Structures are given as C-alpha cells and as structure tokens.
Amino acid sequence: MTLEGLIKPEFDPNLPIYLQIMNFVKKLIVRGILKPGDKVPSVRDMALFLGVNPNTVQKAYEELEREGTIFTRRGQGNFVSEDENIVDKIKERMVKDLIEKYRKELEELGLSKGEIFNLLKEMLE
C-alpha cells in the first residue's frame, strides 16, 4: 500500500500522537484503503509520511497488534488482520467512542441523557 495521494492527518496537540496514528490506520481500514490481509506501510514510510519519529509509529503498530487490528510476519512486515469482521469491529468501536465523547461533552453542558437522545433522534429524522 502506498501513502501517495492520501491526506496527511493534522495532529491534535492534546492527544498522544501514537493514538492518532492508530486511528489513522483504523480509518484506512474502515474506508477500504487497507483491506484484511493487506500489508501496512512500513514504520519508516509511515513516519516519513506523517513527519513523526519512527519510534512513535512503532508504538502505534505495537498497540494495533496487541488489540488484533494488525499482525506481524517476521521479515515481511505488518499486515491488516485477516479477520473478515475486522472492518465492522473497528467501525463499531470508533462510532461508540465518538458517541461517548460527545455524550460526555453534552452532559457537561447540562443536558440530560433524555435530552441528548431526543436531540439526536430529531437530527436523524
């Protein structure tokens, strides 16, 4: 997989970069740019593309492997999990995380869960 033509993410200074790299790779999988079994860009290539230290990319890849999103073939590199449900699993987790983030922010604004639910329902109709 080549990184050519991809839009480089803008990093949020309030979040660890390795977590943002993990999310970038997950979005590539969810969008179908990386498919189950595809080779993930090398640590070096990803670091050059993103303009970050290779150790940061390595940490992100290690965490992605720990959670089962990618796996390593010794001497060949990193690959997207061959689990056919990986895209759905990643998408579901990312959606839940986003909903939880905004739910917390809305509650901090004083909205109840019922009010949040009604607003969301209203927006989707």
Tell me what each language-model feature is.
Residues Y18, S42, Q76-R93:
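Short, cationic-aromatic polyanion-contact patches
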Residues M1-K39, R93, D97-M123:
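Extreme N-terminal segment that seeds HTH/winged-HTH DNA-binding domains in transcriptional regulators
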Residues V25, Y61-E62:
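Short, hydrophobic-biased segments on the C-terminal half of alpha helices
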